[in-house]
Amino acid sequence: MQINRLLATLLAAILLSPIQPIATAQHPPCCGPISPAGARLASFLDNMDVESLWLANQHINWETGKPDRGAGYEGPGNHTHCSAFAAAAAMRLGVYLLRPPQHGQELLSNAQGEWIAGPEGQKAGWRPVSDMHRAQHLANEGHLVVVLFPNPDPHSPGHVAIVRPSEKSAHALEADGPEVIQAGQHNHNKICVRIGFENHPGAFPSGVRYYTHPLQ
């Protein structure tokens, strides 16, 4: 009798629970499948170990992300390192993104935003991307894609992240933007643009800009 009551309770719970959508059938990828080149890019980004390196509140070597000053250092360049991480990742992929020594680490993301949109960025092979759907698609195809928010206040830092391959749905893309990897106040191997840029009012969705560079 007790077993019957337990079974009845379990059955009622199952019947009353919401039916979860089948991801592949009802929510197909927004931006195409991840190509072999996209899979290689994703593996490369995973191996950057961003959640252990380029950490905030310490001075770091921009190329390696490792601390290069003592624990008590309180001078300039010890805050966040989104732009150093983006430049280091691009360099390892054989792509130039404005970096030291051409520009110091302080306010580098703002300078990268100005540089990449200008003639020097175009000469280096960077091209603007029309929208976030195209940005995610290009990343899935294995292209290097960055998303930038130069701060309207030139004395305050902006933000930059790298779009990583993802098979997120169109609904998730519209709500949260592309999937990115970033350093910042908190480093994330995988996070959406909406949350990754939330400390910058006016950034997502209309304030950010996307740029791409082909990879060999």
Regions inferred by a protein language model and the residue ranges of each:
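Bacterial N-terminal signal peptides that target proteins for export
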Residues: M1-T9
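Bacterial N-terminal signal peptides
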Residues: A8-P18
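Sec/Tat signal peptide C-region and signal peptidase I cleavage site
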Residues: Q20-A25
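N-terminal capping segments
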Residues: Q26-L107
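Generic hydrophobic, helix-prone segments enriched in Leu/Val/Ile
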Residues: A37-L53, N57-I60, T64, G70-A71, ...
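...with weaker cross-activation on analogous glycine-rich loops/strands in unrelated enzymes
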Residues: Q102-H188
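Low-complexity, Gly/Ser/Thr/Pro-rich intrinsically disordered linker/tail segments
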Residues: D176-Q216
